């Protein structure tokens, strides 16, 4: 086999690029040291290169024809294969050059290089495969010590792919490596992660298909990436934005809740306390009111409590009426919405039925549907655009056609006769083959209409019931209000009667007092005076002036007392 190579550029060997070393798939021979360049597949098994290139010192731009090199003979397995292990052990030794030395940086042996063609002349030899598989664990630790460079790795991949495409290697002796393996390995190696080295696979697994170890590596990488993504997404999902709670707007028509007895007392006394102490704060005022409330008696507290109870009763009544109005409004709105929907459904169903009734029978009659253009051209615009459909027992359609006065007579008669004949001729056909779909559709429409009517009746009944309930509630409220008003009126009348009774009692007491005063006065006047005459005469004569003299004074006093009592009674009645 002929191997063609290109000599390196003139200059020092130190300027040699690592990409050039990988680009020619061979080894350089300097000072009796043989270095083999071996490529690794997904399972990290080494192949011995069959195509080898010798890098000689720069002697110009000459080209040399080198005879093919035969592979070394198989070594005896009993000798431990020392000849095969020597080239792999020489990888760690530095390469001697002219005047200086350099150490090439090889990529790690665990790297999977895709789309790289490798010669397989020597792969099928069991001895070489066995020796390379056994020596992998020994040489792997030495080769993995070299630090990789991403730029050099990518450059070497490009050179190798170019060499494979240019046809340096024969296509019959080439195998390909899976591309997804390199993408996974490159992504992890360039990122700084070190992938675990896989064990070498047996020689039977050397084929164009990817090895199971590479698929395991891909699955591990995918699982690691998914775990990282889930860990990053976990704290983000834990923080949920708090939705602000919207406060419901109060209805102005809703009745207000009643106030407690203490609040009523506070309202009554706050103004007085503020008037006495204008500079007092709200806290001081509240303290004063609290002390006053504590000092109040039970009777005074009961007055405020009664007021609160009455306010609570009125509030409950108003709340019941308010809720009943809300229920009636909601029911009315739902009834309106349902009526609108039912009307829309009925309109849509009527449109569908009219279209079906127009289309299906006309399609059965060939004579009527055969000449629509001639009818449109011959008949004027006075003809009705839509025919009237009537449900006949024979499933016939009666079309109303209005013939204008200016219409020629030779068109109208044949038209009517043809329509009559077609209708008469189509009657038995419709009896024999009726349109089942239209009948089913009509039945469905009738059922829907019946259901809608039932729903409407139910809604009307519900509305009537709600209206009756509302009227009953209003009547109850009116009755309660009337009863409350009557009770208040009766209480006022009772109070007025009690006042009148009290006034009468006062008048009686005053009259009794007046009578007592009169009696006392009369007794005082009737006392015996000094004896100027005989006692009998004095007794007879003395009482006469005594009795007659105080009469006008007593009458005046009684009239004054009566006038005062009348004025007091009138003032009290006017107040009440």
Curated annotation (Swiss-Prot):
Residues 528-542 have a biased composition (Polar residues). Its main location: nucleus. InterPro entries: HMG_box_dom (IPR009071), HMG_box_dom_sf (IPR036910), TOX_HMG-box_domain (IPR051365). Residues 240-250 have a biased composition (Basic residues). GO terms for biological process: apoptotic process; negative regulation of neuron apoptotic process; positive regulation of transcription by RNA polymerase II; regulation of apoptotic process; regulation of transcription by RNA polymerase II. Residues 223-239 have a biased composition (Basic and acidic residues). GO terms for molecular function: chromatin binding; chromatin DNA binding; phosphoprotein binding; protein homodimerization activity; transcription coactivator activity. Keywords: Activator, Apoptosis, DNA-binding, Nucleus, Transcription, Transcription regulation. GO terms for cellular component: cytosol; nucleoplasm; nucleus. Residues 204-215, 428-443, 549-563 have a biased composition (Low complexity). It is found in: Nucleus. It comes from the Eukaryota. Signal peptide: none annotated. Pfam families: HMG_box. Expressed mainly in epithelial cells. Expressed in the central nervous system (CNS), in the ileum and within the brain in the frontal and occipital lobe. Induction: Up-regulated by GPR39 in neuronal cells. Residues 189-258, 422-443, 519-563 are annotated as: Disordered. Residues 255-323 bind DNA. Transcriptional coactivator of the p300/CBP-mediated transcription complex. Activates transactivation through cAMP response element (CRE) sites. Protects against cell death by inducing antiapoptotic and repressing pro-apoptotic transcripts. Stimulates transcription from the estrogen-responsive or BCL-2 promoters. Required for depolarization-induced transcription activation of the C-FOS promoter in neurons. Associates with chromatin to the estrogen-responsive C3 promoter region. Homodimer. Interacts with CREB1; the interaction is not depolarization dependent. Interacts with CREBBP (via C-terminus). Interacts (via HGM box) with CITED1 (via C-terminus); the interaction increases estrogen-response element (ERE)-dependent transcription and protection against cell death. Interacts with CREB1 (phosphorylated form). The C-terminus is required for calcium responsiveness but not for transactivation activity. The N-terminus is absolutely necessary for transactivation activity. This is TOX high mobility group box family member 3. It comes from Homo sapiens (Human).
């Amino acid at each position: 086999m002929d191997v063609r190579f290109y000599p390196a550029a003139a200059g020092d060997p130190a300027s040699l690029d690592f990409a050039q070393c990988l680009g020619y798939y061979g080894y350089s021979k300097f000072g009796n040291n043989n270095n083999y360049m071996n490529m690794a597949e997904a399972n990290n098994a080494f192949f011995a290169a069959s195509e080898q290139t010798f890098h000689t010192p720069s002697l110009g731009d000459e080209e040399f024809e080198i005879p093919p090199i035969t592979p070394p003979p198989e070594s005896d397995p009993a000798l431990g294969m020392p000849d095969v292990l020597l080239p792999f052990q020489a990888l760690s030794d530095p390469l001697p050059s002219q005047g200086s030395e350099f150490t090439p940086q090889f990529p790690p042996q665990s790297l999977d290089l895709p789309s790289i063609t490798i010669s397989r002349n020597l792969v099928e030899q069991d001895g070489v495969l066995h020796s390379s598989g056994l020596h992998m664990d020994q040489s792997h630790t030495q080769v993995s010590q070299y630090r990789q460079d991403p730029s050099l790795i990518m450059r070497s991949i490009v050179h190798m792919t170019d060499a494979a495409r240019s046809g340096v290697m024969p296509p019959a002796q080439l195998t390909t490596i899976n591309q997804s393996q390199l993408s996974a390995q490159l992504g992890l190696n360039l990122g700084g992660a070190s992938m675990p080295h896989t064990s070498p696979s047996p020689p039977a697994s050397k084929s164009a298909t990817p090895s199971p170890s590479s698929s395991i590596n891909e699955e591990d990488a995918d699982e690691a990436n998914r775990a990282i993504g889930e860990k990053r997404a976990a704290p983000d999902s834990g923080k949920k934005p708090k939705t602000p709670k919207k406060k419901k707007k109060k209805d102005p028509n809703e009745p207000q809740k009643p106030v407690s007895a203490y609040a009523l007392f506070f309202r009554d006394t706050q103004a007085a306390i503020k008037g006495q102490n204008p500079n007092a704060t709200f806290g001081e005022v509240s303290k004063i009111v609290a002390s006053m409330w504590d000092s109040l008696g039970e009777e005074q507290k009961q007055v405020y409590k009664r007021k609160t109870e009455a306010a609570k009763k009125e509030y409950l009544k108003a709340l019941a009426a308010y809720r009943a109005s809300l229920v009636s409004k909601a029911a009315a709105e739902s009834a309106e919405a349902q009526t609108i929907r039912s009307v829309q459904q009925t309109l849509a169903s009527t449109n569908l039925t009219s279209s079906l009734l127009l289309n299906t029978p006309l399609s059965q009659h060939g004579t009527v549907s055969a000449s629509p253009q001639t009818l449109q051209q011959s008949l004027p615009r006075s003809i009705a655009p839509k025919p009237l459909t009537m449900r006949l027992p024979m499933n016939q359609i009666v079309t109303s056609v209005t013939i204008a006065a200016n219409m020629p007579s030779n068109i109208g008669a044949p038209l009517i006769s043809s329509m009559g004949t077609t209708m008469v001729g189509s009657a038995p056909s419709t009896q024999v083959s009726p349109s089942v779909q239209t009948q089913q559709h009509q039945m469905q429409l009738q059922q829907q209409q019946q259901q809608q009517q039932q729903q409407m009746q139910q809604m009307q009944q519900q509305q009537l019931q709600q209206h009756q309930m509302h009227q009953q509630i209003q009547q109850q409220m009116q009755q309660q209000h009337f009863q409350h008003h009557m009770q208040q009126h009766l209480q006022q009348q009772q109070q007025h009667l009690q006042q009148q009774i009290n006034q009468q009692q006062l008048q009686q007491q005053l009259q009794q007092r007046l009578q007592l005063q009169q009696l006392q006065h009369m007794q005082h006047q009737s006392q015996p005076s000094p004896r100027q005459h005989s006692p009998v005469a004095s007794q007879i004569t003395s009482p006469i002036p005594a009795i007659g003299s105080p009469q006008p004074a007593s009458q005046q006093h009684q009239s004054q007392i009566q006038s005062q009592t009348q004025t007091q009674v009138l003032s009290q009645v006017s107040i009440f």
